[in-house]
Amino acid sequence: MKLSFIIPAWNEETLLGLTIKSIQQSAEDFEFEIIVADDASDDRTSEIAKELGAIVVSCNNRQIGLTRNDGAVVATGDLLIFVDADTVVSKTVVRETVEAIENGAVAGGSFPMFEGNVPLLAKVITPTLRIMFRLLRVAAGAYMFCTPESFEKAGRFDPKFFAAEEVHLSNKLHKFGKYKTINARVVTSGRKFRTHSSFEIMMTLVLVTIPGIRSIKKRKNLWYGPRTPQ
């Protein structure tokens, strides 16, 4: 099974290298490719990706769903794995991902752990959100996987949504087979908690679990706002 890791990126020179290296180490037992969809970065994002051997797709969307789609278009693997540019993947995560597909799932995800200093509100609410996402069988964004066939049948990521596009795709993927939330967890940056209030972030995560909520489109700044190193 060939794995295609797709990383949407915008001005991710600080953390992208760590993400790519974690994938390379974690997927070494499999045939794999790493695709970085660079959404008009004005830093060294593309250069770092190329230096580390990743395939770089240049785009100018300012829309994470379309950027993920652009990366998927050039993928040649038997499994599409979408990883955020600030997320570290382990061997256990990759192994459980492959096992999920081998056991009949067509899609799935991993609920992330946040690194660094995280506000108390986030620490309190995150376990509840993890249960909600598992019960609803939707991806939390930092790590999601699906077969190319189910991805196309579901219509790819919906460009109407500037955020939470993975939740809406997850709901559509349910029509085409089993969805599996793996037990292993990726580690993602807690930097958003340092540029946005924990209440804003937690409410965004809660809203995306509610069918029909589209106000999430207005929260583009949460994904394309100022970057902090860590």
Per-range role (PLM):
Residues I7, I20-K21, E31-A40, V57:
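Short beta-strand/loop segment that forms part of the nucleotide-sugar
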Residues N11-S26:
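Short, well-formed alpha-helical segments that are part of the catalytic scaffolds
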Residues T14-L18, D43-L52, T92:
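Acidic helix N-cap motif at the loop->helix transition within catalytic regions
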Residues D38-S46, T87:
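A conserved acidic beta->alpha catalytic loop
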Residues C59-A75:
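Glycine-rich, basic loop-to-helix element that forms the pyrophosphate-binding segment
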Residues L80:
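Short aromatic/hydrophobic "clamp" motif used to bind/position activated sugar donors
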Residues K91-L120:
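Conserved donor NDP-sugar-binding/catalytic core segment of glycosyltransferases
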Residues A163-L169:
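Acidic donor-binding loop at a coil-to-helix junction in glycosyltransferase catalytic cores
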